[in-house]
């Protein structure tokens, strides 16, 4: 992840595969670790973070959400976007809130084949490690 207060600094961890279901008959060991730009959309406050606004997405992925997953978007984001005022959709994940609430954002991702042969295997939910947010907050606290 990157945070606004530390532009260009990345907080990284090994990427585990999304938790989900395959649409093909292959072993779970074929799942590639979480990858792609979907996390940008979700950490902004859309995608899985706004799953309660999308009946089809909720129907397909809702059972994969962690406990309290439907509330995660509203809990971890910081402000209602003016264009989404009628929906009261808030955006912008706050690292400090992730740490204080002991929650990580949720990201909806396709599950890809780690051998690159079968392409998309299915879909699922990924949560970045909470330690990334703790590390980011600690680094922010060291700024002058």
Where are these regions (language model features)?
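Anaerobic metallocofactor- and corrinoid-dependent redox/one-carbon enzyme cores
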Residues: 1-144
